[in-house]
Amino acid sequence: MPGRSDLVYLDSSALVRLFVPDPGALALQRFLAPRARRVSALLLRTEALRAATRAGLSPPRMALVRALLDGISLIPADAALGDEAGVLRPPELRSLDSLHLATALSLGPRLAAFVTYDERLADAARWYGLPVTSPS
């Protein structure tokens, strides 16, 4: 059914919980299991691989991270999205978080959930009316 809310947006604070030991990972896995359409900004790929590198993951675990990323539709930023991200409120929102937020906002009513564990980003997303969740 076109236009129905079926997309789940993941920011890096959510995805990292799936490959770095975290007590909330199981709740997130359960939340995501029935939801096949996962999306994020293209910058998620870099953020996730940097986090995995900082965590010192082994090559097999790095392959798992890449497999997780391959299961997410990544949306590239263009100049218009960059401009939109640059003026989002609040002014204290960090640049990469504003890119995540602008990308999620671009999905409109198709967005079923915006998954983040970053409180500042969650607050901003709620202010814009996004359906924020942090399964725990």
What are these regions (language model features)?
Residues 10, 39-40, 76, 95-98, ...:
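Short beta-strand scaffold positions
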